[in-house]
């Protein structure tokens, strides 16, 4: 078992908190010391109470799903003898309302573009199988109920 931590910090910067007129900007600090400016998505909380330049939880969720899938995929490619030179994913999440009318990210679409080199290059079928295994072994995917699909990259 391992434990993973993040420190989330928010401070009131205006006197209008009780009127709902307050910034939702905050920071995420990770165990390696990296601090990331965060904010709700402007599609959820409009400016000036959000900051579109900051990472929002919805983007971070999509990035976590994509990153975990990629890391498992790279491990599997190596184990199967496929040399990966680059892996770029244009992942996207879709926010909808569930049956109770509550917003959630109902789907994440991964769209990886993977470049290989060497004598052994995977077939389309090999790639599909590696993506299937990566999804099965990704602990983030195993922790969520969101539908995750993989589309062909460009």
Which residue stretches match the model-derived regions?
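Extended beta-strand/beta-hairpin segments
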Residues: 1-63, 74-154
């Amino acid at each position: 078992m391992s434990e993973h931590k993040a420190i989330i910090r928010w401070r009131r910067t205006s006197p209008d908190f009780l009127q709902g007129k307050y910034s939702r900007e905050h920071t995420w600090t990770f165990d390696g010391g990296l601090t990331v400016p965060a904010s709700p998505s402007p599609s959820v909380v409009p400016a000036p109470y959000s900051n579109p330049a900051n990472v929002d939880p919805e983007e971070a969720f999509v990035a976590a799903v994509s990153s975990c899938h990629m890391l498992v995929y790279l491990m599997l490619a190596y184990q199967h003898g496929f040399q990966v030179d680059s892996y770029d994913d244009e992942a996207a999440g879709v926010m909808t309302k569930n049956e109770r009318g509550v917003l959630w990210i109902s789907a994440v679409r991964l769209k990886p573009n993977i470049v290989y080199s060497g004598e052994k290059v995977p077939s389309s079928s090999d790639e599909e199988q590696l993506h299937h295994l990566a999804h099965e072994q990704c602990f983030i995917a195993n922790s969520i109920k969101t539908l995750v699909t993989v589309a062909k990259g460009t």
